[in-house]
A protein has these predicted regions:
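Negatively charged, low-complexity tracts enriched in Asp/Glu with abundant Ser/Thr
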Residues: 1-66
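Generic hydrophobic secondary-structure signal
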Residues: 20, 33-40, 60, 73-75, ...
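Generic N-terminal initiation segments characterized by hydrophobic and/or small/turn-forming residues
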Residues: 33, 46, 70, 108-115
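Intrinsically disordered, low-complexity regulatory segments enriched in Ser/Thr/Pro
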Residues: 65-109
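Mixed-charge, Lys/Arg-enriched low-complexity segments
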Residues: 1-17, 91-120
Length: 120
């Protein structure tokens, strides 16, 4: 039986809105995610990439609305282990194509590398 896919679409938030959310809601606890959002906001990515947040997760895509289960990069930063977690979901009903964990200081570099690798 073939499964029917229903997109989990979410309207993208502006990078300013996301930045303010990390400042106001998390009150400095997620400084690494805030740094990444500021990096995107202040780069040429700001007009090519769309973002959305879900609690402590940043989801990035090239589409608006963002489908969380299709062509979406899910990024979290673990406050206890001080590690970045990147998970790229290309297609629904399939395992993520890309799952990586990075040291704290490598987040922005690895984000830029991922965007270049996937040609976003």
């Amino acid at each position: 039986m073939k499964r029917k896919y229903r997109p989990h679409n979410t309207k993208a938030q502006t990078w300013e809105y996301i930045e303010n959310g990390y400042i106001e809601y998390w009150q400095g606890k997620h400084e690494r995610l805030l740094e990444l959002v500021r990096h995107i906001k202040n780069s040429h990515f700001k007009d090519r990439l769309f973002g959305s947040t879900s609690l402590d997760k940043l989801v990035v895509s090239i589409y608006d609305p963002i489908d969380y289960h299709q062509e979406a990069l899910h990024i979290t930063f673990d406050l206890w282990s001080r590690k970045w977690h990147f998970k790229y979901i290309a297609m629904p009903f399939q395992k993520p194509e890309f799952v990586r964990t990075y040291d704290e200081e490598k987040g922005i570099e690895k984000f830029d590398n991922f965007i270049k690798m996937i040609k976003w």
